[in-house]
Amino acid sequence: DGDKPETEESLETEEESTGTLSENDEDTELVPEQNTMEDTQDEIQLEDGAENVTEGENTTGELSDNAEEETFTSEEADRFSDGSAPEGELGTYQTVTLEIEDGQDITAPLNTLFLQLKEQASDETPCKIIIPPGNYKLTGTLCMYSNMYLYAKGATITKTSPTKHLILRLGNTKESEGEYEGYRNVIIDGGTWDFNYQCVAEKDEPGGFVGFCIGHATNVTIKNATFLNNLKSHFLEFGGVKNAKITGCTFHGYYKNYVKGGQECIQIDCCTDEDNVFPQYMPYDGSTCEDFVIDGNVFEDVFAGVGTHSMMAGKTYKRITVTNNTFHNVKKRCIEFLNYEDSTAENNTCLLYTSPSPRDRSVS
């Protein structure tokens, strides 16, 4: 989303509404129940190769018979618990390192490893997949599954394909269980993820592409990662997600020839295909997002920071906490809460200009 033409406002006008929603905000309008309000969604499609990865595909990413078992901490156990384990009980997870050469295309090897681990990964024994430090190409969509921990510290993954496609999603099909039951217990830790809009052949044609698109899920963590060079859309987009944490991440860079729409780095959304709002996950049951912690991130030289510019009549986004983040040189707005309930934005620092200014201030 974020592709609907709108009147460009001055930075001074936008800064006055940072972190708040005006009743007369031109991005929104009231709609009947079960309808949505949204800027037109970018036309985003999974590449066929990413959506149809099969079990038998050849790859260098192999699961060893002697995959290392590790004990995870009580904190990690809580993150992976489905609530059925006795309190304080620790579990184990298998750690598997992706076999890949520096400079290789990571798409097929990692997707095949995800599929190999899909049935094996459980609430009791989740799987940790390590991407070795190095530089890798990405030419399609990565499809991750429940009970997986993707560790990418020291790895740089750069999109090199000329088409517009998701960088990462849960599952390799749009169909899943509804509400928050589709996927669970997913952690993405580290890595530099370069969306590299420069490589896209038709940047100025309608639509951009979302980076990580997460829907119908519970217990999702994205931490310590760097996201670069967004094209007319979102680095991270969530729809119908409960219990999510985005911490310690950096977001930088966008296509500056395009200055319309939302383009939030972190978009909090609802599951509906009305106006192409969030079409990547079925069913379109109107599930919103609840219990988010967005803390300690840096947003630098981006179009918009965090928030929501679509909603379903009669439904709210609940318990969204945006704290201790730094926003520097944001074109449109840092934070937008739309139809939020029991939510907080505090102790965020907004540096409104590239050089020190009396207008630089903290938002509490």
What do these predicted ranges mean?
Residues 1-84:
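Intrinsically disordered, low-complexity repeat and linker tracts
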Residues 69-111:
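Right-handed parallel beta-helix/beta-solenoid
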Residues 101-111, 125-165, 171-173, 193, ...:
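N-terminal extracellular ligand-recognition/capping segment immediately after the signal peptide
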Residues 145-147, 152, 183, 188, ...:
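Parallel beta-helix/beta-solenoid
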Residues 159, 195, 200, 229-230, ...:
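Residues in short coils/turns that link rungs of repeat/solenoid architectures in beta-rich domains
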Residues 164-167, 209-211, 233-235, 257-258, ...:
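Structural detector of coil-to-beta-strand junctions
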Residues 353-360:
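Conserved small/polar residues in nucleotide/adenosyl-binding loops
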